[in-house]
Amino acid sequence: MEVNILAFIATALFILVPTAFLLIIYVKTISQSD
């Protein structure tokens, strides 16, 4: 079973980018509420 590197990278980006985006918004919201 071969692992398609491009598919792996695409999947990782598809998961990490929205997660990082949400984390940034979350941190900014917490900072503003203080």
Swiss-Prot record:
It comes from the Eukaryota. It is a single-pass membrane protein. One of its GO terms (biological process) is photosynthesis, light reaction. One of its GO terms (cellular component) is chloroplast thylakoid membrane. It is found in: Plastid, Chloroplast thylakoid membrane. The keyword Plastid applies. Pfam families: PsbM (PF05151). The chain crosses the membrane at residues 5-25. Keywords: Chloroplast, Membrane, Photosynthesis, Photosystem II, Plastid, Reaction center, Thylakoid, Transmembrane, Transmembrane helix. One of the components of the core complex of photosystem II (PSII). PSII is a light-driven water:plastoquinone oxidoreductase that uses light energy to abstract electrons from H(2)O, generating O(2) and a proton gradient subsequently used for ATP formation. It consists of a core antenna complex that captures photons, and an electron transfer chain that converts photonic excitation into a charge separation. This subunit is found at the monomer-monomer interface. Belongs to the PsbM family. PSII is composed of 1 copy each of membrane proteins PsbA, PsbB, PsbC, PsbD, PsbE, PsbF, PsbH, PsbI, PsbJ, PsbK, PsbL, PsbM, PsbT, PsbX, PsbY, PsbZ, Psb30/Ycf12, at least 3 peripheral proteins of the oxygen-evolving complex and a large number of cofactors. It forms dimeric complexes. This is Photosystem II reaction center protein M.
